[in-house]
Amino acid sequence: MRCYNLLIYLASILWTFAADAQVTVGAARTADYLPLMQGKRVALLSNHTGMVGDEHTLDLMLRNGVNVTTIFSPEHGFRGTADAGEHVAGGKDVKTGIPIASLYDGRTRMPAKSVMDNIDVIAVDIQDVGLRFYTYYCTMIDLMNAAARYGKEFIVLDRPNPNGMSVDGPVLDMKYASGVGRLPIPTLHGMTLGELAMMANGEGWLKDGKKVKLSVIPCTGYTHATRYRLPVPPSPNLPDMKAVYMYPSTCYFEATPVSLGRGTNTPFTVYGHPQMKAGDYYFTPNSRPGAKNPPQLGKRCRGRNLRSMSEDDMIAQGVNFEYIIDAYNAMGRPKNFFTSFFELLAGNAKIRQMIESGASAEQIRATWSDDVKAFKTKRKPYLLYPES
């Protein structure tokens, strides 16, 4: 664990140098949000990504006299080291002693009334990556529902979307709403959390159509064309920008027996299986923090390494089902290749049916073109940043 924490620390240093120095995140704009918290009991949804320079937003708030009564933690926990989907218990922050209420403890993703009774304002400062199935925004929506139910204020300290230049992929059919899909948005929605919160509030997407008293503290120096490089890896299996850019296309392997590199140094940028009959790349997933029991643990997998692609090409492809189709064919098109989780990730049942019937990636892409155009029009009133 100490070795893993050291790696995370070193990675955060490298990513910090790569971050866009011209962008100021919402959490750094204290003059704009501290007055909104004055004299109020504040809960903070954050994790290891909630940094302003080398200081965590929690510490920054406390240093400025904010009365933080509760910390809400998302998937991977407040420190960001738990496995994907792992239940994370609550407790207390070791440094500050502030209670941590886990929203990923396996029981409920709605905070208890007793917790909400000790809160006036919920603040959000967490780094999202702009994917419909990335759970940080889902946790934000759950908290917005709680705030609307209990009459609490809601503040989003905005951060750039590293995939904010792209809008692509199937729009979620709400029949398949789940813990990896809360809103009728494309796989790549191209919005920041602040913009997404405004859209959910404005479009009546919160439970029972309720609205929350919402404030968004925007970034400065950011546009949707900005190639923003994250200063801190957002979760254990997105260790670098290539993983972030490939995630929209390779995450679908989570619903198959194919390894997407969890348990290696290259998650989401390789894929393979012991029974694949194509590809010239071999790897063996091992147990490690953030991937304690990865698919195909300890087995030598044959497949493909996508890391030779340029970042430009990774971004340009948007959502690409070519890799899933390739693996499916290379394993002989087995009947049990897809689990029911695939529909939740894809957002509909149609894509699985098309793959099984032999459709190409381009034929699949054509199915969401009109929906993406309609979404782009619908989201325009909620955009805080120029699109170019």
Which residues does each predicted region cover?
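Glycine-rich, aromatic-lined ligand/substrate-binding cores of catalytic
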Residues: 220-297
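Conserved anion/nucleotide-ligand pocket segment
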Residues: 177-248
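Glycine-rich, charge-decorated loop segments at or immediately adjacent to ligand/cofactor-binding or catalytic sites
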Residues: 80-85, 155-177
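Short internal beta-strands
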Residues: 69-77, 157
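Bacterial Sec-dependent N-terminal signal peptides
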Residues: 1-23
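Glycine/threonine-rich flexible loop motifs
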Residues: 128-140
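Conserved functional hotspot residues or short segments at active or partner-binding sites
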Residues: 267, 271-369, 373, 387
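Glycine-rich oxoanion-binding loops at beta->alpha junctions
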Residues: 89-119
